[in-house]
Amino acid sequence: MTLTEIKIKIQKLYNTNPEIHINVHCNHPKMYYDNEPAIIRGVYPHIFQLEVKEDNQIKSFYMQYEDVLIKRVEIIELTGSIQPSI
């Protein structure tokens, strides 16, 4: 998948159903989420904004499309392998 394809698919999710599930593994800033419900809050030319609920607080952060390309961020709805959360 190319960056352009990733941008188009994320834009489509944002327009149709922004409630998604993500896997994130980043060291800077330190974020680890597995099959975590999230909401796409914004889509911009080089980044997109996500919100997750953690410890009864909403955390908002921005990710680059490259993060999806290098698999630092996985949007489960893009891969088509939704797993039920335990």
How should these model regions be labeled?
Residues 1-33, 54-86:
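Short glycine-rich, low-complexity segments
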Residues 21-23, 37, 49:
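Beta-strand secondary-structure signal
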Residues 34-41:
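Short beta-strand-centered aromatic/proline hotspots
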Residues 42-48:
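Short, conserved beta-turn/loop elements at beta-strand boundaries and strand-helix junctions
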Residues 48-54:
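SH3/SH3-like beta-barrel fold
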